Amino acid sequence: MKRLEVSNQAKLPTQFGEFYIQCFREKNSNGSKDHLVIFTLDFPENPLVRLHSECLTGDALGSQKCDCGVALQMALERISKEGGLVIYLRQEGRGIGLFNKVNAYALQDKGYDTIQANEMIGFKDDERDYGIAGEILEYYRIKKMRLLTNNPKKIAALEKYAEVTRESLIVCANEHNQGYLEVKKLKMGHLL
């Protein structure tokens, strides 16, 4: 854990129940980035884990363009009952950052899908790196987990660190995110 600085733990009462939070500061040549872990105090040997990338528009503003905010809420609700943790990675817009995400949204408003929009502004379909999540799992000594995801890249990344059983997290489509969800399934291989 040479590149991680770990904060103290603090209580976080939520609408889903009481959690604890802890911050992990990732240090690299570009500076530092803080990631948050939201967890139940006593989680089982095979906990529920949600690897969630930051989505300000979905998580905080309730955007209907994506499934992020609803998926996070569903995960917190299940984890509060069954025990586990959310690893909240600061990788806005599948790793392209908020500024670029807004530019990609503008292209989506013109009819381009999420992948086309990213590529038009010079990015791959997904720029995220999940290596830090593996270090966080090691910190909590998690060797086995039930991963709440539909993303095969997350499964493959975390299988390097622990035994992973996938549990799907299906968010209902709406008129604003239906095309987005179809692209995730057809072009990104999501298990929807």
UniProtKB/Swiss-Prot annotation:
InterPro entries linked: GTP_cyclohydro_II, RibA, RibA-like_sf
Keyword Cell inner membrane appears in the UniProt entry: no
A Gene Ontology term for the protein's cellular component: cytosol
SUPFAM superfamilies the UniProt entry points to: RibA-like (SSF142695)
Entry binding sites for Zn(2+): C55, C66, C68
Active-site residues (renumbered): D126, R128
Binding site for GTP: R50, L51, H52, S53, E54, E92, G93, R94, T114, T149, K154
GO molecular function: GTP binding; GTP cyclohydrolase II activity; zinc ion binding
UniProtKB keywords: GTP-binding, Hydrolase, Metal-binding, Nucleotide-binding, Riboflavin biosynthesis, Zinc
The reaction(s) this protein catalyses: GTP + 4 H2O = 2,5-diamino-6-hydroxy-4-(5-phosphoribosylamino)-pyrimidine + formate + 2 phosphate + 3 H(+)
GO biological process: riboflavin biosynthetic process
EC number: 3.5.4.25
Pfam families linked to this entry: GTP_cyclohydro2
Pathway the protein contributes to: Cofactor biosynthesis; riboflavin biosynthesis; 5-amino-6-(D-ribitylamino)uracil from GTP: step 1/4
Manner of cofactor binding, per the entry note: Binds 1 zinc ion per subunit.
Cofactor(s) for this UniProt protein: Zn(2+)
Family: Belongs to the GTP cyclohydrolase II family.
Role of this protein: Catalyzes the conversion of GTP to 2,5-diamino-6-ribosylamino-4(3H)-pyrimidinone 5'-phosphate (DARP), formate and pyrophosphate.
Protein name per the record: GTP cyclohydrolase-2
Organism for this UniProt entry: Helicobacter acinonychis (strain Sheeba)
Gene name of the encoded protein: ribA
